[in-house]
A protein has these predicted regions:
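Solvent-exposed, non-transmembrane regions of membrane-associated and secreted proteins
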Residues: 1-208
Length: 208
């Protein structure tokens, strides 16, 4: 797998097709370097405050974080229902959620295969609420992104695992979501973290 960023360990990719999100996944959600490169696994929880456990795609609670660039398209910006509007997540000081993405796919991919999750809802938490990353018995994905304009809060997008595929037995439609010669990646904004995209809008690389 093409490493792309020196000093970071690429885990694979995340795709949310309904929101045109395709990002590389690295191993450091707690540094500017990691977040400026794309998505990263987030693994510091109440149970594991120093992040000793390395998460595994398709197992337990796989946490992911990326920037919300408040533009509806870069990083995880597309997961906020209305750009630059706290509603429906924060209303009159009350933390709410949203079901606008329920049922949509979250796809993770690494050298072993594709992990097919379905969104079950969104909730809002403060930026200190690391319990959302606590280990779970069931396989799920927990995506963390900032709320705009109230950036002290985090939108949590929850997904449950539905299927695991090897590259050989995965449906062609799912495989195509990670075809970097045809699909654009959306990790970089010129005004914040300029860089070369890995997809058809940049290096046009493959998954090798």
């Amino acid at each position: 797998m093409h490493q792309a960023v020196k000093g970071l360990d690429k885990q694979g990719f995340v795709s949310i097709p309904s929101r045109n999100i395709l990002l590389p996944v690295y191993n450091d959600a707690y540094s500017d370097k990691g977040l400026n490169a794309g998505a990263n696994y987030a693994n510091k929880s109440v149970i594991d405050p120093t992040g000793e456990h390395k998460p595994i795609m398709g197992e337990g609670n796989y946490g992911l974080a990326a920037h919300n660039f408040n533009d509806g398209q870069t990083g995880f910006s597309g997961l906020q229902q209305y750009t630059n509007h706290d509603s429906p997540y924060l209303q009159d000081g009350h933390l709410k959620g949203s079901d606008w993405l329920n049922g949509q796919k979250i796809l993770l991919a690494n050298a072993h295969g594709i992990y097919d999750y379905r969104i079950t809802g969104q909730t809002l938490v403060t930026n200190k609420k690391i319990s959302v990353l606590n280990p779970t018995q069931t396989a799920q994905v927990t995506i963390i992104s900032c709320l705009f304009p109230s950036t002290d809060y985090r939108i949590i997008t929850h997904g449950k695992l539905k299927n695991i595929y090897t590259w050989d037995n995965a449906p062609r439609k799912l495989v195509n979501e990670f075809n970097l010669k045809e699909k654009n990646t959306n990790a970089h904004a010129s005004w914040w973290n300029p860089g070369v995209e890995e997809g058809a809008n940049g290096q046009k690389g493959g998954t090798e």
